[in-house]
Curated annotation (Swiss-Prot):
Chain positions recorded as substrate binding sites: 8-11, 66, 123, 127, 131, 191-193
The protein's Enzyme Commission number: 1.4.3.5
Lineage: Bacteria, Pseudomonadati, Pseudomonadota, Gammaproteobacteria, Alteromonadales
InterPro entries per the UniProt record, alphabetical: Pyridox_Oxase, Pyridox_Oxase_CS, Pyridox_Oxase_N, Pyridoxamine_oxidase_dimer_C, Split_barrel_FMN-bd
Note on how the cofactor is bound: Binds 1 FMN per subunit.
Gene3D superfamilies: Electron Transport, Fmn-binding Protein, Chain A (2.30.110.10)
Protein family (similarity comment): Belongs to the pyridoxamine 5'-phosphate oxidase family.
Reactions catalysed, as given in the entry: pyridoxamine 5'-phosphate + O2 + H2O = pyridoxal 5'-phosphate + H2O2 + NH4(+); pyridoxine 5'-phosphate + O2 = pyridoxal 5'-phosphate + H2O2
Protein name as it appears in the record: Pyridoxine/pyridoxamine 5'-phosphate oxidase
Cofactor(s) annotated in UniProt: FMN
Pathway as given in its UniProt record: Cofactor metabolism; pyridoxal 5'-phosphate salvage; pyridoxal 5'-phosphate from pyridoxamine 5'-phosphate: step 1/1; Cofactor metabolism; pyridoxal 5'-phosphate salvage; pyridoxal 5'-phosphate from pyridoxine 5'-phosphate: step 1/1
Length: 212
């Protein structure tokens, strides 16, 4: 077994106090996202999306956040993917944003709701053409005999859609994750980290400090 117990560091970038918190957690999330982008972090919109299968086995993968507002967090994916199939059976999910250089993380619990075709199409048309074509190529989560199969399919579809717009695949969609709770974590000295959780009760958010 590889021993990693000596790998540690102190957290000293500042704390998080109750007086710092807005009543709406999305306002704090927007501030932290802006600061993550301003700090030029690598992939600040990357989030871990966790789902479970019919046996309760959890699965995680990194997905890019594409939009957020007071209603929740939006991402897009292949509807034949493992995550989409698991969401169809159980739409309870969690999201995690790891902003390590800022000594921050945000954890979200909520339910995923499928977006309308109009909403998906609006985003799909903003993607680079090669990315649109790639959406047609991959049967996400299916087994491949070799990478060449995937690349061959890509060039085949690229020739097919050489002229004009790339249509939206019927098997490509998106989700809005409506949060029921959002936790903000800020690293603190001596491992006395600051954690605050917002829990939704009807239309209001209740705020509590959690022990680190």
């Amino acid at each position: 077994m590889t021993d990693l117990s000596d790998i540690r560091r102190e957290y000293a970038k500042g704390g998080l106090r109750r007086a710092d918190l807005p009543q709406n957690p999305m306002d704090l999330f927007e501030l932290w996202m802006t600061q993550a982008r301003d700090a030029e972090l690598s992939d600040p919109t990357a989030m871990c999306v966790a789902t479970v299968d019919e046996h309760g086995q959890p699965f995680q993968r990194i997905v890019l956040l594409k939009r957020f507002d007071d209603t929740g967090f939006v991402f897009f994916t292949n509807l034949g993917s493992r995550k989409a199939q698991q969401i169809a059976a159980n739409n309870k999910v969690s999201l995690h944003f790891p902003w390590h250089p800022l000594e921050r993380q945000v954890s979200v619990l909520g339910e995923a709701q499928a977006l309308s075709t109009a909403e998906v199409l609006k985003y799909f048309m903003t993607r680079p053409k090669d990315s649109q074509i790639a959406a047609w190529v991959s049967q996400q989560s299916s087994k491949l005999s070799a990478r060449q199969v995937l690349e061959g399919k890509f060039f085949e579809m690229k020739a097919k859609f050489a002229k004009g717009d790339v249509p939206l695949p019927s098997f490509w969609g998106g989700y809005l994750v409506r949060p029921s709770s959002i936790e903000f974590w800020q690293g603190g000295e001596h491992r006395l980290h600051d954690r605050f959780i917002y829990a939704r009760h009807d239309a209001e958010w209740e705020i509590d400090r959690l022990a680190p």
